[in-house]
């Protein structure tokens, strides 16, 4: 049975969180477009910025992302997802942190038919 387009987006989100938890940068990279942009409270991050940040954390923290998807809308080759996300960050040395909040993500379907993260407005704050 094939997945609906919404199901494919949900699967991508699950894969992203699993790969992030495992420190699997190659899988995460494959889930982003080359021109991905992350809008964060600290400013704009492009692909190279995200990769550098991911590499700095890999092996130094344990991550656990808990999504609460509120809405997914698919319009042709673009999909928008509103997600209430909670991320538990446990440094190997230091105090654990929890960040939570709204995330609005835009995905684009490539010529290969695969969905990839294209724009991400991440409003997580420490809780």
Predicted segment positions?
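Polar/charged side chains located within well-ordered beta-strands of beta-rich proteins
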Residues: 13, 20, 67, 81-83, ...
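Short beta-strand segments enriched in hydrophobic/aromatic residues
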Residues: 32, 85-87, 121-124
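A short, structured loop/turn motif at beta-sheet edges
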Residues: 72-79, 108-114
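Beta-strand elements of well-folded, non-transmembrane domains
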Residues: 87-91, 107
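A solvent-exposed, acidic/Ser-Thr-rich amphipathic alpha-helical stretch
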Residues: 6-7, 25-75, 84, 92, ...
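Short beta-strand edge/turn micro-motifs at domain boundaries
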Residues: 100-127
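Short acidic-aromatic low-complexity motifs
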Residues: 2-4, 10-31
């Amino acid at each position: 049975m094939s997945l609906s387009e919404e199901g494919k987006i949900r699967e991508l989100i699950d894969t992203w969180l699993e790969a992030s938890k495992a420190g699997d940068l190659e899988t995460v990279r494959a889930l982003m477009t080359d021109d991905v942009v992350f809008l964060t409270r600290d400013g704009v991050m492009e692909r190279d910025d995200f990769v550098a940040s991911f590499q700095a954390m890999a092996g130094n923290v344990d991550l656990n992302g808990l999504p609460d998807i509120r809405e997914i809308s698919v319009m042709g080759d673009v999909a928008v997802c509103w997600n209430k996300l909670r991320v538990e960050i446990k440094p190997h040395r230091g105090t654990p942190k929890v960040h939570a909040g709204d995330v609005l993500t835009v995905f684009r379907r490539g010529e290969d038919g695969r969905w990839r993260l294209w724009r991400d407005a991440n409003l997580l704050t420490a809780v």
